[in-house]
Amino acid sequence: MSLLLDTCVLLWLADDPRQLPERVRTQLGPNGPPVHVSAITALELGIKVARGKLQLPLPVSEWFPALCQRNQLHILPVDASVAAASTELPDIHRDPFDRILVATALQRSMTLVTPDGAIPRYRGLVTLW
């Protein structure tokens, strides 16, 4: 099993891991499975910062890779296959960032770590929360 983190989960991991359920914290610990984040998460964070909805101590271009390195998170690229697959998903979730995460998790057989109640409705997707 490999995990893929939703953007909010990454932020809680960075700021206050106690906001994460115990079963999630256990999986994100040193004895847990490999943990990944999508490159699309950096874009989502940058947009939130630019719109004033999020403050980070460093520019996203520095903060995101440093956080990933510190927490041993693997950054996954968004390729054409994932981008196209995200457009072919059922219209359960309209957020394009979440659709990219769902498509990534489905294509790579990963567990998506998310509190979003709509995301588990995608057939074949495994989630953790």
What are these regions (language model features)?
Residues M1-V37, R51-A66, R70, R108, ...:
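Short, well-structured N-terminal submotif of metal-dependent ribonuclease cores
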Residues V9, T41-A42, V82, L101, ...:
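Alpha-helix capping/helix-boundary segments
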Residues D6-C8, L45, S86, A105:
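Generic structural signal for small/hydrophobic residues in well-ordered secondary structure
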Residues Q55-S61, P65-P115:
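Active-site neighborhoods of divalent-metal-dependent phosphate/nucleic-acid chemistry enzymes
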Residues I75-L76, T127-W129:
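Short acidic-hydrophobic, aromatic-tinged amphipathic segments that line or gate anion-handling sites
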